[in-house]
Amino acid sequence: MPSLKEIRNRITSVKKTQKTTSAMKMVSAAKLNRAEDTIRRARPYSVKLRAVVSSLSGKLTPDDNPLFRDQAGKRVAVILMTSDRGLCGGFNANLCKMLARTLHEEGIDSAEMHIVGRKGRDFFRRTNHQIVADYPDARPEHYLDIVFTVLDGLTKRFAAEELDKVYLVFNEYKSILTQEPTIQPLLPIRPLEDAKEEGEQEILFEPYIEELIGPLVQQYIQNQMYTAWLGTLAGEHAARMTAMDSATKNAGEMIKQLNLYYNRSRQAAITKELIEIISGAESL
């Protein structure tokens, strides 16, 4: 049975942990608000660009641009987006496990991995998949450079038929409580039915559609990766905020139980001392 001092030390330790988790929750909430604001500001451009590319894809054949060409084969490259830090529940583990399971089901034993974030890198180091490039500690101010670096190499290799498919894997941010693991085909570019609905009217291209293909396609692919990163960032903060909120509540419950146990132990110790005093007095 632990002593009263040990119980007091345990209560003090749990209270310190509770303060830490509460502070982390507030920090994550503030970061989530900023991330959501960035997503809201980026969405109009993303929606319009998707509508333009969807309209464009309906007017092109694979011969017009190699990035629209569907290629049979299992030479697959994956761009995986995870976080650098933990303490965010199953945010990273669920995504990595889903990707590993999907690759196994598709019979892809050695995909080419381009990984943003430490957690994804640490997970796939234990597999047979080849980590071609990883970007730990990816700060927001450096992220566009990473986007351009990754996509420039992959689009050139896809156009040269060195790759058959490129997938973008990330946690799509739905709400504070929901971050959905997503595997999104990035290359080849396919018609986007949802973008057609969002775009509403048909888009006219002037003067020549051929002059717009290259720049628009590059902007679209870059925007897809950037949008996925924004969702991953918001999802990470939401998952960490939820996890820290749960940890703070659990710490509060533990403190209540420890206080109750402490009071009972203290009462039992006092009762025992009184009995000993009374017994000693009676013996005299």
Language model region names:
Residues 1-284:
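C-terminal beta-strand-loop-alpha-helix "lid" module of Rossmann-like NAD(P)-dependent dehydrogenases
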